[in-house]
Each structure stands twice: as structure tokens, then as C-alpha cells.
Amino acid sequence: MGAVTDDEVIRKRLLIDGDGAGDDRRINLLVKSFIKWCNSGSQEEGYSQYQRMLSTLSQCEFSMGKTLLVYDMNLREMENYEKIYKEIECSIAGAHEKIAECKKQILQAKRIRKNRQEYDALAKVIQHHPDRHETLKELEALGKELEHLSHIKESVEDKLELRRKQFHVLLSTIHELQQTLENDDKLSEVDEAQESTMEADPKP
């Protein structure tokens, strides 16, 4: 067991004494001794009562000193309790701050984890696509092919326009030829009619 402190000894004595309950008894005893001392009939009896009063006064002084010590001890304990209370409050406030900081760190860690997952998913998607250099090459080749096809288209359109014009000229020629043939047929019919008329008329 550890050493017993003075405060513990005083506390035990207070418990035994009934927390100062004997002071009233001592005061009553002091008053009775004082009355007996005043009414003493002999010097010996007066001296005896005087010694009792001194003893009772010493006990009262000791009790008062003990009470003051207990009071000071209680004040020190109250100050100590207030100090401990403030330390506990500071510890609680510090714990709340640490909890808030931990929550922020957890949220930040969640965001970092989410960003990392999104980055990994995007990286997988990018890996399935061709390389940028190869894509540029393909785009360049497609551009050249498109340019070549554009030239071919222009050439085909030019040829088609030429054929359209030639067909138009051919149709015009055929139309003129038909007109000519029709005119020739009409002339032949007129000539035949004239010849028939001449053959039908007799010479005089």
C-alpha cells in the first residue's frame, strides 16, 4: 500500500469526530468549566478548572485548525477538480476537432478513391482505342483517299455532262433527219401525183 497522506488522515479524523460535531460539546464544557472556575471555593479547585479551560481551549483551537485545514484541502481539491474539468473540456474539444479532421480526411480519401477508380476505368477505355499516332495516320490516309475520290467524282461528272451534251446533239440530229425524211416523202408524193395527172390527160 502507498503512503497515507495528511489529507487522508484529516479526512478519517473528521469522519470519526462526526465532521466537527464535538465542537458544541467542547464549548458547553468550556462554559461549565468557566462557571465552576468563577464559583470555585478554593484555589486548588480554581486552578483545576483553569487547567480544564486551557485544555478545552486547546482542543477547540486544534479543532478550528483542523477545520481550516480541511477547508483549505477542499479548496485545493475544488481547484484541482476545476483544473481537471477544464483539461477534460479541452480534451473533448480536441477530440471533436480530431474527429472533424478525420471526417475530412475520410471524405478526401473517398474522393481520391473515386477519382482513381474513374481514372482506371477511363484508362481501360483508352487502351481499347488505337494509338493517337496511328489514328492520325489513318485520318491522313482517309483524307487522301477522299481527295482522290473527289477527283474521280469530278471526272465522272465532267464525262457525264459531255455525254449529255453529245446525246442532246444526237437527238437534235435525229430530229432534223426525221424532218428531212418527212419532207422528202412529201415531195415524192407530190411528184408521183403530178406524174399520175400527166399520164391521165391525153395529148391533142
From Swiss-Prot:
The modification N-acetylglycine is found at G2. Belongs to the THOC7 family. The modification N6-acetyllysine is found at K36. Tetramer; as part of a THO-DDX39B complex. Component of the THO subcomplex, which is composed of THOC1, THOC2, THOC3, THOC5, THOC6 and THOC7. Component of the transcription/export (TREX) complex at least composed of ALYREF/THOC4, DDX39B, SARNP/CIP29, CHTOP and the THO subcomplex; in the complex interacts with THOC1, THOC2 and THOC5; forms a coiled-coil dimer with THOC5; together with THOC5 and THOC6, plays a key structural role in the oligomerization of the THO-DDX39B complex. TREX seems to have a dynamic structure involving ATP-dependent remodeling. Interacts with NIF3L1. GO terms for molecular function: RNA binding. Keywords: Acetylation, Coiled coil, Cytoplasm, mRNA processing, mRNA splicing, mRNA transport, Nucleus, Phosphoprotein, RNA-binding, Transport. Residues 105-204 are annotated as: Interaction with NIF3L1. GO terms for biological process: mRNA export from nucleus; mRNA processing; RNA splicing. PANTHER family: MAINTENANCE OF KILLER 16 MAK16 PROTEIN-RELATED, THO COMPLEX SUBUNIT 7 HOMOLOG. It is found in: Cytoplasm; Nucleus; Nucleus speckle. Residues 146-204 form a coiled coil. The keyword Cell membrane does not apply. Ubiquitously expressed. Residues 50-137 are annotated as: Interaction with THOC5. Pfam families: THOC7. Residues 182-204 are annotated as: Disordered. This is THO complex subunit 7 homolog. The keyword Acetylation applies. The modification Phosphothreonine is found at T5. GO terms for cellular component: chromosome, telomeric region; cytoplasm; cytosol; nuclear speck; nucleus; THO complex part of transcription export complex. Component of the THO subcomplex of the TREX complex which is thought to couple mRNA transcription, processing and nuclear export, and which specifically associates with spliced mRNA and not with unspliced pre-mRNA. Required for efficient export of polyadenylated RNA. Plays a key structural role in the oligomerization of the THO-DDX39B complex.
